[in-house]
């Protein structure tokens, strides 16, 4: 948690940006795993954390711009709770720590909101992502879940504020990235033939937990790198395979890191693995060189895709104009995801508010396969923190589908692609801060080039 002045300033800026109405913040409650008292790891809503800094369950908050009131709604803990969970700060103490002087019991929130509505005032809320939030909004505001789209002025104001990271936020993110890098470096040194994927996951978890960190998302650690979000960790690791890791640490403050590595299970890459890896490495490095204020990140995505197509042409996998192939979408056979996303208090920062606002500033997204998965398209600005994570994949089911449909035969040499059918996938990822003149990598350097990776094996 930052100093209370940080939260006071954030709320003041938000009030000025929205202008009028009542801003409603729904804090997260505990979630039962398989029964009520056996809960998932608690995680506060990120916008609640950003403006109120309190990582406690059972709280909601209101910023009443019209009446100039800031209120945290919650309940004092019962003696039963204290017996089981220990001494906790009072509600007033929690609120005071973040510059809030007014607290009210949870039961009074419904009445407060109903009164504001009866007065003809607007109650702004952010899009809900938890079922209990949807039920609360239906109860408090009379909105059925299908119509709970959120207040656009509120969403836009939050996105604009949270998109630009302050110096103290950057310091936290850098710490998270340092620990994330340590996780990847430890795994790169640790992997050996005969292990199971879950042993590598345990090694990374040890690094995170030894720094009092949680994971910023469910770890991807797999010999099946062609599966983009593969959370199964039960495979035996064999000589000659590639091992793909996508993992990150989350600090107690909530700020995240997110990096990816691809490692040969053997001491070195095979010639075929190295050839594809070097193409992916070129995609990554050319993308990083292009980072600067003002460049649309969609343009950087297109650049990375063209670099890939040119490299795959040299291997005989594709043919024709790289520019035409990317424009038509043929590249997505090998690169079916985006180049990166915003990162901060969420690993995909503010994704719950809608990519259309966070990464597109309200402009429509492409519907083209591959391109539609680009989460960040807008021109980059100083203070943005985002990932750079191009990849190359050989997905048998996608290859079979496109070949059967006769798709992009002017660009794709399917007979040659068939030779790579069981190759897997390669993705490497770093986190970058956009500066006034360019960009800066956040966190320790992880091995990126084939030689750097092999040096740790």
Residue ranges of model-derived segments:
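Active-site neighborhoods and metal-handling regions in enzymes and metal-associated proteins
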Residues: 1-457
């Amino acid at each position: 948690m930052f100093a209370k002045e940080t939260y006071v300033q954030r709320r003041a800026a938000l009030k000025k940006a929205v202008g009028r109405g009542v801003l409603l913040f729904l804090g997260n409650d505990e979630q039962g795993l398989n029964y009520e008292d056996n809960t998932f790891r608690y995680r506060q809503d990120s916008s609640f954390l950003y403006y109120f800094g309190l990582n406690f369950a059972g709280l909601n908050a209101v910023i009443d711009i019209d009446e100039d009131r800031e209120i945290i709604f919650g309940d004092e803990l019962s003696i039963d709770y204290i017996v089981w969970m220990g001494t906790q700060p009072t509600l007033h103490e929690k609120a005071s720590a973040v510059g809030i002087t007014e607290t009210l019991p949870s039961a009074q929130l419904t009445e407060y909101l109903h009164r504001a509505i009866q007065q003809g005032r607007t109650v702004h809320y952010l899009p809900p992502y938890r079922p209990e939030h949807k039920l609360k909004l239906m109860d408090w505001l009379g909105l059925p879940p299908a119509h709970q789209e959120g207040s656009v002025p509120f969403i836009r104001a939050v996105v604009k504020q949270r998109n630009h990271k302050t110096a103290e936020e950057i310091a936290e993110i850098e710490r998270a990235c340092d620990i994330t890098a340590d996780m990847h470096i430890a795994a790169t040194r640790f992997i050996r033939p005969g292990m199971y994927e879950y042993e590598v996951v345990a090694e990374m978890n040890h690094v995170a937990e030894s720094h009092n960190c949680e994971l910023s998302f469910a770890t991807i650690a797999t010999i099946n790198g062609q599966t983009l979000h593969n959370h199964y960790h039960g495979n035996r690791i064999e000589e000659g395979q590639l091992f793909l890791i996508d993992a990150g640490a989350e600090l107690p403050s909530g700020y995240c890191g997110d990096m990816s590595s691809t490692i040969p299970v053997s001491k070195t890459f095979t010639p075929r693995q190295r050839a594809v890896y070097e193409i992916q490495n070129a995609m990554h490095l050319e993308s990083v060189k292009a980072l600067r204020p003002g460049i649309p990140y969609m343009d950087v995505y297109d650049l990375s895709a063209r670099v890939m197509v040119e490299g795959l042409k040299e291997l005989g996998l594709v043919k024709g104009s790289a520019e035409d192939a990317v424009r038509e979408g043929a590249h997505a056979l090998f690169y079916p995801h985006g180049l990166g996303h915003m990162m901060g208090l969420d690993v995909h920062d503010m994704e719950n508010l809608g990519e259309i606002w966070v990464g597109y500033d309200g402009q429509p997204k492409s519907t083209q396969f591959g391109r539609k998965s680009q989460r960040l398209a807008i021109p980059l600005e100083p203070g943005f923190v985002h990932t750079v994570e191009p990849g190359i994949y050989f997905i048998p089911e996608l290859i079979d589908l496109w070949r059967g449909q006769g798709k992009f035969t002017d660009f794709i040499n399917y007979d040659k692609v068939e030779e790579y059918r069981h190759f897997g996938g390669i993705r490497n990822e770093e986190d970058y801060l956009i500066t006034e003149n360019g960009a800066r990598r956040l966190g320790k350097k992880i091995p990126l080039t084939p030689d750097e990776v092999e040096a740790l094996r």
